[in-house]
Amino acid sequence: MNKWSRLYVITVRRTFPGRRNIVLTQYWNKSKKMSDESNDVKWNDALTPLQLMVLRDKATERPNTGAYLHTNESGVYHCANCDRPLYSSKAKFDARCGWPAFYEEVSPGAITYHRDNSLMPARVEICCARCGGHLGHVFEGEGWKQLLNLPKDTRHCVNSASLNLKKD
């Protein structure tokens, strides 16, 4: 198998005001994906193909398409695969990035952090601590604490496909 057959491509089109469409492409290596056999992870049979791609294969849903992007309902967001509580709706804020954003997880240890070198500069990937499902990425020092008067200057950029909201 050559190196090109091992690469997968996700293409996202974004329109910027006054400019042509810019195609942003993310490449990742097949070996970075989670195998079905690894770590005794059981994948929920009720997951949609998109949820499987995001949680297991570390894909990213298209921006501004997620079910929870504009949701303001009170509750706790759980992992779509293993049902572990991950984020409180109280920690959700509008970062206008195209994905739901949270400034902290529901409790310490709910998520794990991993270095992601798939794009430059390197990012920090966030995963469910129980099943290892890919949630998204975390960004620090963007100024949200001062801009929106948040307790932390952290943005957890999370795919809606990796979450289920359990309303209060």
From Swiss-Prot:
GO BP of this protein: cellular response to oxidative stress; protein repair
Q: Which cofactor does it need?
A: Zn(2+)
Annotated MsrB domain ranges read 40-168
Q: Which GO terms describe its molecular function?
A: metal ion binding; peptide-methionine (R)-S-oxide reductase activity
Q: Which reaction does it catalyse?
A: L-methionyl-[protein] + [thioredoxin]-disulfide + H2O = L-methionyl-(R)-S-oxide-[protein] + [thioredoxin]-dithiol
Which enzyme class, named as a word?
Answer: oxidoreductase
- GO cellular component labels: cytoplasm; mitochondrion
E.C. number:
1.8.4.12
What's noted on cofactor binding? Binds 1 zinc ion per subunit.
Locate the active site: C157 (nucleophile)
Pfam families per UniProt: SelR (PF01641)
Q: Where does Zn(2+) bind?
A: C79, C82, C128, C131
Q: Does the keyword Ribonucleoprotein apply?
A: no
Please give the positions of the paired cysteines in each disulfide bond.
C97-C157
Q: Which UniProt keywords apply?
A: Disulfide bond, Electron transport, Metal-binding, Oxidoreductase, Redox-active center, Transport, Zinc
Note in the entry = Present with 799 molecules/cell in log phase SD medium.
Describe the family membership recorded for this protein in Swiss-Prot or TrEMBL. Answer: Belongs to the MsrB Met sulfoxide reductase family.
Report the protein's function: Methionine-R-sulfoxide reductase which catalyzes the reduction of methionine sulfoxide (MetSO) to methionine in proteins. Plays a protective role against oxidative stress by restoring activity to proteins that have been inactivated by methionine oxidation. Protects iron-sulfur clusters from oxidative inactivation along with MXR1. Involved in the regulation of lifespan.
Output this protein's name.
Peptide methionine sulfoxide reductase 2
Give the originating organism.
Saccharomyces cerevisiae (strain ATCC 204508 / S288c)
Gene that encodes the chain: MXR2
